[in-house]
UniProtKB/Swiss-Prot annotation:
EC number(s) stated in the UniProt entry for this protein: 3.1.-.-
Coiled coil: none
Organism: Campylobacter fetus subsp. fetus (strain 82-40)
Homology family: Belongs to the endoribonuclease YbeY family.
Leader peptide range in chain numbering: none
Protein name: Endoribonuclease YbeY
Amino acid sequence: MIICNDSYPSVLDKIADMLTKAEVELVFVSNEEMREINRDKRGMDKTTDVLSFPLTYVPHFPIGSIVINTDLASSKALELGHSTDDEIALLFTHGLLHILGFDHENDDGEMRRKEISIMEHMGLPKSLIVRNGC
């Protein structure tokens, strides 16, 4: 189940249900808000597309928060030729996998393979899969 500060693409519910039965918080922010969060939480004074913040497991509470930069999601979607909702689906998947313990920095491609599998299973555009930096 997703707890969100705004409306969101319905495919996110399907992705969340595929990966976990726990609740996850989803927050949409602007470039400037994301820059502030990234600076305050990670010491990096720049914007980014998605951040995830896992929480210690407590029954009936969210397992973490996913923060998505809608400004960057929109511009990346335009650049790659798919919808903003599809870009948000990839960013949500990426953030949720981090919350669930995946780490693309150290997993020899396991997280990326999982993202590709989910994107294909959901019938999302190949432009989400064929890209750098995720």
